[in-house]
Amino acid sequence: LKWRYATKKMNGTKVPQEKIDYILEATRLSPSSSGLQPYKVLVISDKALLEKIKDIAWNQNQVIDCSHLLVFVAWDKYTNERVSEVFNYTMDQRGLPHSNMDDYKANILSIYEPLGQEWHAHHASKQSYIAFAMAIAAAAEQKVDTTPMEGFLNEKLDELLQLEGTGYKSTLLLPLGYREDENDWLVNMKKVRTPK
């Protein structure tokens, strides 16, 4: 983590697929509230699509200079169907009956449902931030540079990626690539954090 920084200029070199897979696996293993993992990660490397995303992301060049762009998208709401699907899969993997989760599921839904869809979307979005942080740490472990991004127009990106009707909304962008030392003003700056 001392090595990583928010890379300002990437050189376009491709990140090997095994490193991309490692980073994605870190997002999959990320903790989430009640283990629901209410998000997924889209991987984009098509240059024409990245050009369109750059326009939506306030013309940040890392979007087109990166090797792969990770787009984090989160559930727009918690539903019985979604929660059941995750819990049923979990029980199947553990060789246990689905009914083992019935009381817990009912409790979650009784708490979440009255809070409304805006709360649901916000809560799911926060879970994607945890996975986002795991991806950044995993990338640093692999010596892959990243630029964490919230700076983009979510609704326009959702439209471009045709997320309407899928139950997902975009939350974060994470370009992956390699720094271009000679053209990155931040690369040699001292890393500074507030004191302990």
Indicate where each model-derived feature is located.
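Short helix-capping/linker segments at secondary-structure and domain boundaries
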Residues: 78, 139-145, 181-183
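Small-aliphatic-rich amphipathic alpha-helix that forms the alpha element of a beta-alpha
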Residues: 23-29, 70, 106-160
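Short alpha-helical functional segments enriched in proximate histidine and acidic residues
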Residues: 30, 34, 52, 138
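An N-terminal domain-cap segment
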Residues: 3-37
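Glycine/small-residue-rich phosphate/adenosyl-binding loop
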Residues: 42-126
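C-terminal helix-cap and adjacent tail motif
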Residues: 1, 6-7, 169-196
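A generic alpha-helix structural signal
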Residues: 20-24, 53-57, 161
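A glycine-rich helix N-cap at a beta->alpha junction
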Residues: 62-76, 163-183
